[in-house]
Structures are given as C-alpha cells and as structure tokens.
C-alpha cells in the first residue's frame, strides 16, 4: 500500500503547479490532469500469473466541476502466463459535444479458462465435492502412488472465450436530472470448448484433465503411466450442453463451422440522476432503464431483445462523507421472440450498462455478486441486489492530493427468475453420459424415458438428476478502499456465500463456491 501511495501521489503531484484552492468540505480542488498508474498482478490456477498495468487519467479542467471531471481515460494491458490476455481502452468525454456526454470503449480479451457453470442458477448442479478432490502432493513426494482419477476438475467448468468489444454511448439532458441514452454496442465472439493442451500445460501427469490422446501432450516420457490409458476423453459441461442440444450449434458455430458469433445492437434508455458526485456518491438517486435491440439485419448472428433496469440510492448517515448507506436493485430481462427461439446463451451472461462503464460479466463475481463464481447465474431473466455501508475512517492531504481510506460492509444477492429451456434435444445416446458425469452413476434408462427424465433438470425432481429449485444466491463480506481525489479508488474485498455455512446435509451447501478475494477499482455503483 505504501508503494501504491508513492506511485500515484508522485505522478499526480508533478502535474500540480497552480496555487492550492479548497472547497467547502476542505478538499483540495483539483485542476488539470491527474494520473493514476497501477500494476495489475494476480494468479489463477488455469490462466497462470497475471502481469500488466493499468493507467487512469482524469482531466479536471479549471476545477469548476470537482469532484467530477471533464474527461477520463482508462487503459489496461494484462498478460497471463498460459496464454490469456486483456487489452482495454475507455474514454469518457463531457465537453466534446455540447450538452452531450460521450462514452466509448474498446477491449480485446482472450480467456482460455472462462467460467461456465450452466444455466438457471441452482438448476445447474455445482459438483463442489469433486472439485475438492485431488492427489496429495506431499504424499506423492514421499513415494506414494498418485491416483490418475483424482485429476484437477476445474476445466470441467471452463470454456475458451475470446471477445472483441466496442461501444459508443451518448447521454443528454431532457430536464436537469432526467437524461436520454442512445448507444451502439458490438461484440465478436470466439467461444468454444477449452484448449486442453493449454489447460494441461506444465501440470503433473496425474493432474491433467482427461483429453484422450491430448492427455499426454505435455507429459514427459519418463512420467508416462499406463493408468492414463484408462482415462477416456472427459467432456466438459459446455460440451455436454452441446451434445444434449441445450446450446444449439447455431449459437456457437457459423455457417462455415467456425466458432465466430457477432452481436450488433442498439441501446435506447432513460436515466434519472441526482447524485452529489459520481466517483463516490453519498446522497441522491441514480436510476436507469434501457432496451437492447439486436436484430440480424443489424449484423447479429442471432436476433434477440433484452432490457435492463437499475435503481441505486445513497443515504448519508454521518455527513461529510463519513458514513453512507447505499443500495442497488437491478434486473436483466428478455422480451419478444424470434421465430420461437430463445436468446442466444452468449448474450445472457452480462450485467448491461450504458455510460462511462462497460458491461460486466454476470451474475457472479466482483461487479455483481461478490463471493460467488463468475457467471454462476445465467438465465433469461435475472435479478440483482446490493446493500452497503461505506465508512470513510480517515482522510488526509498528501502531495497536494485528497486521500482517504474507507471500509465497506456489504451483502449481495442475485437470482434467476426465468431460466432457459433445459429440455433434452440431443441424441438419445448422450443421455447416459449426462447421468454418468452429473449424477455419478451409469444406470441404463429406456430411451422412451430419456427425454422426459432429462427435463427434470430445471424442476429439481428427486432421484433423476442432481438439480435444485432456484432461490436467492446471497453473499456478505468486507472491503477496504484507498481513495485519491474521489475518483481514483483501489478496492480490496472479500466475499463469502451464505451457502458455505449451510448444514452439510443441505442440498444447497457450497453450491456457490467457498468465497473469493478481489483487488479491483472503484465502487460497484
């Protein structure tokens, strides 16, 4: 943290040459450009180490709008040691077009281990018990023979995803607090099954995910074991959904058989905003609603129509930004039908946003429901809620910058209120595979019952499939934030799902994972 203070403070201080002025709260009024560089360092067992850098630049102009800014630039470049990478650029401009705010963003993301936990929340069982099994490396080091069936199970819930995303949003006044919103959003997807050679790279032979002949691609000759011959190709959940017809081929592959999909949409919306400031608001309402229109004639591979509604409210409990109560209610839904088909699955896994932020992967993880897995909830309609207490326990001036530390206590929640159709539409022979890998048994089922039994996946009938009735996915946690000049905010947060503390005989025990720690930027809202 000390290094962070030195980094951001020194860079920002170099740009401060004018005499210091203060506002009514005793804050230094910032003018001109402020720079906020930050290293991006993290680790993921499937993607490897993340190394990169983030740079935020704020233009406060003559300071007349402080703590709000005139312009903002955000740049990020990150690489992962196993091949994933992220490049992102955002620009938010309030004065280029008179009386119109223009926000644009471009990003390119290669994720070779993107989370995929199925559809409809608890309707897709999460096999946490199998996820927790592994070989005892210490025992193996002392001479014990590894069990080739206790391989790392994480890749079962992963896909290979590359996305190019670009957007341009415009927001203008209708009245003092009411705004219109218009935007164009474009995505190019390359989503397919995992790259097994990459996932198994540099793993011990007994940890490699069963991939048929590919299981041996990165195994040294001296480590080859005959036991590996017994490990047949293990389909991932994504591959099973394809086999069963839950995900249609036309949602993944184009007419040339390539896993390339296009998403071209127009967004129209309204926003009501009475916040006292944008970066860390302490009072006011911020509400918005928009529709997403993505017809084929606009360039989309699959037509769909969605909407998003969000209401945020901020209440000062102790004035002067000391203690704030904030909450958020959000809903993502689907409307209309396109020749009777559902919305394409790849369009459902976002919390959609207009303005100076980009869409967030959801529902699950940092920007939506802290503490549960990324994209744990994917459905046609989904609700989201957040309640926070924000306590700024210290603020000070350093290098002519306004600095503060804040604690956050929060609870998040989300729920799939309308799920995708999970009816079995694949080859009858693949149903046995479903029972083998999801239910853990290989019982033969007469073909005349297979489709009827399979439909129980989204109604939770006992005994046929491991599935649960959907209910709220709730979490709680704490966070610490370093704040510089209101807008540059570095967050450290840890979230835990309530399901982790259910009784072990509860069918919902550990269905949202075991919790997660995050290092990120800003407040969620």
Label the predicted regions.
Residues 35-37, 71-75, 101-106, 178-182, ...:
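Transmembrane beta-strands of outer-membrane beta-barrel proteins
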Residues 14-15, 21-33, 61-70, 96-102, ...:
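Short loop/turn motifs that connect adjacent beta-strands in outer-membrane beta-barrel proteins
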Residues 33-35, 47-51, 55, 69-71, ...:
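Residues that define the transmembrane beta-barrel architecture of outer-membrane proteins
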Residues 482, 511-525:
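Outer-membrane beta-barrel "beta-signal"
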Residues 16-25, 42, 105-107, 114-320:
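Transmembrane beta-strand segments of outer-membrane beta-barrel domains in Gram-negative
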Residues 43-45, 57-59, 77-83, 93-95, ...:
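Transmembrane beta-strands of outer-membrane beta-barrel pores
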Residues 34-43, 68-81, 87, 285-295, ...:
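Transmembrane beta-strand segments that form the barrel wall of outer-membrane beta-barrel proteins
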Residues 256, 266-269, 277-401, 417-419, ...:
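C-terminal outer-membrane beta-barrel translocator/porin domains of Gram-negative envelope proteins
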